[in-house]
């Protein structure tokens, strides 16, 4: 509990946050060009995918101590003293302007006007609790090959919730989409490996027979991407292959160095140490992954989740009386040790003798809360591998394998994939890229669907219905503080929209909102809007207190938060192609991003 030294007491005490992962010390990530968007060509190994790669990584929150304006206002937080007992630390409360600056410093908003692309706009933001932040994110737009009969972009949005370091999430933000693109390229070219997954695979069988007698096999089926199970299989294969590369990289490097006779010298740091750490750290740290892939040509949205980040969609439902509500659709399910389906899956993959130990206290082997993750090799390597790598590479303090580590792997990166047909409930006319101003009534919101992707730092404090209601009310023009019930009136009951009975709508941490007007509508960026309201919303003092606590103390009260909100409408008929059609909305001049080749 926070002890107030303010001239007036805090409105409500703040709950301590229970970390999901044991903390680990890690060096800061390499310098990045903050707030800069890069466009570069991406090659996929085939002709079916070409075009531009657009990404933006998370900015790091390094500046935690800004001077207060005027007379400082102080409060105290409990800390563990060096003697092992409890003590307190006095902190300075951020001013209102400093709080706003902290909330907004990483936000970005983009308007999209690309031909045959249903994305109207997307807003992003991240807020660090760890230092450096362990979350990351990306946005990627790929163009189909110009010769393809199917027109429309392939759009990827990803959020990555790292733990025990930032290295794995950073690798996912730069590599995962490339792995998925390579698998999709095989699907688009009708590869036999995916054609064989068709319900009637006679075409692939005849192709094999034809190949045996001729050198010119028939043209592969070019329509494999019509089949959702095949697209899901491609995404799953990409996730698994990237994770295998991450986990096996240190093992391959050790074999290579042993053959070359150049193992790191334990008494001095050299090139070999640097090379070893670059392979070892992404494998030792871990990350959840949430990837939304929008296939504009097929008008479908594929959402893949590994871990416990969440995706939720709001769908506008007119009531025929000049109004309507936003229907809540959960697009993911938390993969944690408290999910009965995940517990049953893990138990089925190990001997019955381990049934009581594979998941204990809601954690894999009593340690890891998410049951699926990239990296986390201490739950995947064969027994003895970690000790061998530590002896050869001398990485410093590294936790050993968990207890009852008998039949690895215990954790997988293979995702669950949900597919949504966006042609259902098609909207009316598409808005122009400049029509994102508030509307005066809910009769004509500027988008008829939106998707929210976020790491669990957001869902710790807001449930799915609250998130859809907050975005939906914002799109319907609400701009004044609201009670919770008032905000929830903008959405329909989500109970029937849940993909399972495993509480996908419940925040993991009981919020401390209090009564009255608890939600605020003061931010133009929808991701910032959600982040602010997750921390207290209209309870301004609570928001300031939470943001005034520096790392690592802040980790006891809140997690890193990364959020992307995507507005969807009718695909544009006359939008731009090539490298055009993506505009910064929140930074003048209002010009498209330029390619950097």
Where does each model-flagged region fall?
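PP2C/PPM-type serine/threonine phosphatase catalytic domain
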Residues: 2-597
């Amino acid at each position: 509990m926070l002890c107030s030294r303010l001239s007036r007491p805090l409105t409500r005490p703040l709950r301590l946050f229970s970390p999901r992962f044991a903390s680990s010390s890690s060096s800061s990530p390499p310098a990045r060009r903050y707030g800069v968007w890069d466009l570069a060509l991406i090659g996929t190994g085939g002709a079916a995918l070409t075009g531009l790669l657009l990404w933006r990584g998370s900015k790091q929150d390094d500046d935690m101590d800004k001077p207060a304006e005027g007379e400082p206002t102080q409060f105290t937080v409990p800390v563990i003293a060096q003697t092992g007992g409890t003590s307190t630390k006095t902190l300075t409360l951020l001013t209102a302007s400093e709080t706003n600056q902290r909330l907004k410093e990483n936000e970005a908003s983009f308007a999209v006007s690309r031909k045959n692309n249903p994305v109207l706009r997307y807003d992003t933001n991240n807020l660090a609790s760890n230092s450096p932040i362990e979350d990351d994110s990306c946005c990627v737009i790929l163009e189909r090959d110009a010769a393809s009969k199917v027109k429309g972009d392939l759009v990827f949005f990803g959020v990555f919730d790292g733990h025990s370091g930032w290295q794995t999430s950073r690798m996912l933000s730069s590599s995962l989409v490339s792995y998925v693109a390579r698998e999709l390229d095989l699907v688009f070219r009708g590869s036999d490996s995916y054609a064989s997954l068709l319900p009637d695979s006679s075409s692939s069988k005849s192709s094999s027979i034809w190949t045996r007698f001729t050198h010119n096999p028939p043209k592969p089926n070019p329509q494999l991407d019509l089949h959702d199970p095949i697209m899901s299989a491609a995404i799953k294969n990409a996730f698994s292959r990237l994770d295998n590369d991450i986990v096996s990289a240190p093992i391959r490097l050790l074999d290579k160095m042993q053959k070359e006779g150049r193992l790191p010298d334990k008494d001095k740091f050299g090139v070999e140490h640097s090379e070893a750490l670059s392979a070892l750290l992404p494998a030792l740290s871990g990350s959840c992954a949430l990837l939304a892939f929008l296939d504009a040509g097929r008008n479908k949205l594929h959402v893949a989740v590994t871990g416990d980040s969440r995706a939720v969609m709001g769908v506008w439902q007119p009531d025929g009386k000049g109004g309507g509500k936003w229907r809540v659709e959960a697009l993911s399910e938390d993969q944690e040790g408290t999910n009965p389906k995940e517990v049953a899956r893990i138990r089925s993959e190990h001997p019955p003798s381990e049934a009581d130990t594979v998941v204990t206290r809601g954690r894999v082997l009593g340690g890891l809360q998410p049951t699926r993750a990239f990296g986390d090799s201490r739950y995947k390597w064969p027994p003895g591998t970690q000790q061998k790598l530590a002896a050869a590479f001398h990485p410093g303090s590294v936790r050993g394998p968990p207890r009852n580590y008998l039949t690895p792997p215990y954790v997988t990166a293979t995702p669950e994939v949900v597919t949504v047909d966006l042609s259902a409930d098609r909207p009316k006319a598409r808005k122009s890229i400049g029509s994102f101003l508030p509307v005066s009534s809910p009769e004509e919101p500027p988008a008829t669907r939106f998707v929210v992707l976020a790491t669990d730092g957001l869902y710790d404090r807001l449930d799915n219905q609250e998130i859809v209601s907050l975005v939906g009310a914002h799109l319907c023009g609400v701009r004044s503080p609201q009670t919770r019930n008032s905000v929830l009136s903008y959405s329909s009951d989500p109970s029937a929209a849940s993909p399972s009975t495993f509480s996908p709508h419940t925040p993991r941490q009981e919020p401390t909102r209090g009564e009255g007007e608890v939600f605020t509508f003061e931010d133009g960026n929808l991701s910032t809007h959600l982040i602010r309201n997750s921390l207290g919303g209209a309870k301004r003092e609570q928001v300031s207190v939470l943001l005034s606590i520096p790392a690592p103390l802040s980790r006891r009260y809140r997690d890193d938060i990364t959020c992307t909100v995507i507005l969807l409408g009718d695909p544009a008929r006359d939008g731009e192609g090539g490298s055009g059609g993506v505009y910064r909305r929140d930074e003048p001049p209002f010009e498209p991003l330029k390619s950097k080749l």
